[in-house]
A protein has these predicted regions:
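Gly/Pro/Ser/Thr-rich low-complexity, intrinsically disordered segments predominantly at protein N-termini
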Residues: 1-174
């Protein structure tokens, strides 16, 4: 399937599909805690993003990681005026909420694809079964990684703010 066919079909589809080198891959539904964690990030960051002229997406807008790859992150921010109406090409911040069905891809192929995006400053993986977050930070031309468990915080440079694990996991029951 061509990129053009994929984008056209995805525009009218009730099911989300990621696109990897000519193949459309259906996205599975997730548990309520997964959705709650993604929505929590929206509540924390959307107003600030709006004030800074940035845009927040949650689960329903694609990120183009290569010419032939489109992924659906759980949460992303872009401050680029040049993004296409159908997808982000220049996100500065991406979050994936981990689940049994996505963890391997989130730590594997998506990690590789996302960290190749020149605009990306942070890639954050949020556990949905415990208070645990992995933060990948762009430091010049290299990436560093930090694991946060129970407490801690990470910065979101493009929004000039920090997020704590307490904010993300407030009232979340495992």
């Amino acid at each position: 399937m061509s990129v053009e066919d994929y984008l056209e079909r995805e525009r009218v589809s009730d099911v989300r599909h990621e696109y990897v080198d000519g193949v459309a891959l259906a996205m599975a539904g997730e548990k309520r805690v997964h959705n709650r964690l993604a929505r929590r990030l929206v509540l924390l960051l959307e107003r600030l993003a709006d004030q800074l002229g940035c845009e927040v997406i949650v689960e329903t807008v694609k990120v183009r990681t290569r010419d032939t790859r489109y992924r659906y992150p759980d949460f992303a921010v872009s401050c680029s005026a040049g993004d296409d109406p159908l997808y982000f090409a220049n996100p500065c911040f991406i979050v994936e909420v981990l689940s049994d069905s996505t963890e391997h891809t989130d730590f594997g192929k998506k990690l590789d694809e996302y960290t190749r995006l020149p605009s990306l400053q942070r890639y954050v993986l949020v556990a949905s079964d415990s208070r645990f977050v992995v933060v990948y930070r762009r430091e010049g031309t290299r990436w560093t990684v930090e694991s946060l468990e129970e407490t801690g915080e990470f910065d979101v440079p493009c929004l000039e703010t920090t997020v704590t694990l307490e904010q993300i996991y407030a009232d979340v029951q495992f």
